Design a protein with these regions (language model features):
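N-terminal secretory signal peptides that target proteins for export/translocation
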Residues: 1-17
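Bacterial N-terminal signal peptides
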Residues: 20-34
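Signal peptide processing junction and immediate N-terminal pro/mature segment
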Residues: 32-43
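Metal-dependent phosphoesterase/phosphodiesterase active-site architecture
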Residues: 42-136, 207-291, 334, 353-503
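Active-site neighborhood of phospho(di)ester-bond hydrolases with catalytic His/Asp-centered motifs
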Residues: 56-58, 132-139, 181-191, 297-300, ...
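Active-site environment of divalent metal-dependent phosphoester hydrolases
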Residues: 63-64, 142-145, 187-198, 259-261, ...
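Core catalytic region of metal-dependent phosphoesterases/phosphodiesterases
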Residues: 79-95, 99-199
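Active-site-proximal segments of metal-dependent phosphoesterases and phosphodiesterases across multiple
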Residues: 260, 265-278, 286-343
Length: 503
């Protein structure tokens, strides 16, 4: 409160009155200025923190074999020359020759052509123009990549296939870097991103060392050597997220080694690489907890239940076999769930769908991670192979807390990349009326889904519609079973949720 003299003695001289009133006026001005300054300071501290933009891309599945006449040219060219080759007019017999490759190497549909890749990059330039960093959460290479290569080069020399894989990966990453100049691009490998076939990879390989050299370009010098070393060992690495994010770190995993389908290039199962990676992850999270770092974790294959495969065999889920799981064990989910106080976001992909999940420890007691758990964002695909519309995600992040505040899914009007219009599919905050994508907010939405088996809530209907980007709401047919997987990441918990008591 500002006080001014109001009671003046009648005997005071005019000079005294002038001086007194002047001083009172000055005091009033200074007081009001101080009050305004305090108000501005208070407003500054209570106003919502300014967010920064980030880009999430996944499952690009770029197919360089779509015009077979160009494949020998690509094999001879450097990745920096690929765009010129791919942009040239298609060969006259392109369709017939590619159909022959598809017959030899059948897939569900077609992956990402150069036209679609180029269209998506143009949309990214427009929609993510302010991005401070970008993530690619795996599967840069087309499905049946190794089969298509052998069909194109039946007499290829040893090592040629690996060289072509390395060139393709480099080309795709460099194209995204060119679309967002100066923006760090962080990449996790997926099950297709291998020099020896789908779900096959050797730890401590020359392939991982070569790709690690490429993917760590632009990393801070103080961190690049360590990142290259761990990536060469098992496809995992640690890097500090860029300013203006503060004291925030990204841990990138190659959880192909943890997959239920994983084998070495020689076709043998081997759990040692997964065990080493999980030990590294736990050590990194322990250090981060001690130094009060905020962590994001990114990998390709999510932990938990493969709902699509499990829903086709519900009798097995409720029987002795149990549900189909994405990973060979539940150790990744268990490690992550123990560090819910450290990890602000986990990014996965693999299903090609737009999904959310939450990881919560089943027996956490009073541990720091018990309160809310960990939010999981599963990024939808650029590839339209499942009939979905190509899409990517533009996110907003709180630089102080590293919490994902909001995101928008941007989808294509067609799968060809020709005359394609990209539009906003939905906005998380607007669709679900949540202040952020924190564990508390995601947990609240999941709880709502769990209570809405009949799909009467607007949020449930929105999720069903947005899950299969641009396509029909088929998820509604298995909605109760699907919802069981959003929180119940262990086989036992999922089975208890889905199956009637006692069966």
């Amino acid at each position: 409160m500002c006080l001014t003299p109001t009671d003046r003695s009648a005997s005071r001289t005019r000079l005294e009155l002038f001086v007194g009133n002047t001083l009172a006026f000055v005091g009033l001005v200074l007081c009001l200025a101080g009050t305004a300054s305090e108000a501005r300071a208070e407003a500054k501290t209570t106003a919502p923190a300014e967010t920064v933009q980030a880009l999430f891309v996944s499952d690009i599945h770029f197919d360089p074999f779509i015009d077979p006449a160009k494949i020998p040219l690509l094999a001879e060219a450097n990745p920096s020359e690929w765009a010129k080759v791919l942009a040239a007019a298609p060969s006259v017999d392109r369709s017939a020759r590619y159909a022959a490759i598809q017959k030899t190497c059948p897939t569900r549909g077609e992956d990402t052509s150069y036209a679609l890749l180029n269209s998506s990059l143009q949309a990214i330039r427009k929609e993510a123009v302010g991005a401070r960093f970008a993530t690619i959460s795996g599967d840069l290479l087309a499905h049946s990549f190794d089969c298509k290569y052998r069909a194109a080069f039946p007499h290829a020399a040893p090592g040629d296939y690996r060289a072509f894989v390395e060139k393709t990966l480099t080309f795709v990453v460099d194209e995204l870097r060119a679309a967002l100049p100066g923006v760090p691009v962080y990449v996790a490998l997926g099950n297709n991103d291998s020099d020896c076939g789908d779900y096959k990879l050797n730890a401590h390989s020359e392939f991982l060392a070569t790709i690690g050299e490429e993917l760590t370009k632009g990393f801070p010098a103080s961190e690049r050597a360590g990142a290259k070393e761990t990536f060469a060992a098992g496809g995992y690495m640690s890097v500090r997220l860029p300013a203006p994010l503060r004291n925030a770190r990204l841990l990138v995993l190659d959880d192909l080694f943890m997959s239920a389908k994983y084998t070495t290039c020689g076709g043998k199962p081997d759990a040692s690489a997964a065990e080493a990676e999980l030990a590294w992850l736990e050590q990194q999270l322990t250090v981060a907890r001690g130094s009060h770092e905020k962590v994001w974790v990114m990998a390709h294959i999510p932990p938990g239940v493969d709902v699509y495969s499990s829903a086709k065999h519900l009798d097995e889920v409720c029987g002795a076999k149990g549900p189909k799981m994405f990973l060979a064990s539940e150790k990744l989910a268990e490690v992550l769930a123990r560090f819910g106080d450290v990890v602000r976001l986990a990014i996965f992909a693999h299903t090609h769908m737009d999904e959310v999940r939450i990881l919560q420890p089943e027996n956490a007691g009073n541990s720091p991670s018990a309160a809310n758990g960990m939010p999981v964002k599963m990024v939808s695909s650029i590839s339209p192979i499942n009939g979905n519309a190509p899409s990517f995600t533009v996110a907003r992040v709180d630089p102080e807390t590293a919490v994902l505040k909001d995101y928008r899914v941007i989808a294509a009007s067609n799968a060809t990349g020709l005359d394609t219009v990209w539009h906003e599919e939905y906005d998380w905050a607007k669709a679900y009326h949540e202040p952020d994508f924190s564990a508390a907010s995601v947990g609240k939405e999941v709880a709502g889904f769990e209570s809405d088996a009949a799909q009467k809530m607007e949020e449930s209907r929105d999720y069903i519609s947005d899950f299969y980007v641009g396509a029909s709401p088929l998820l509604g047919l298995i909605w109760p079973q699907y919802v069981c997987a959003l929180r119940n990441d262990s086989a036992q918990a999922f089975k208890a949720c889905v199956c009637p008591m006692g069966k």
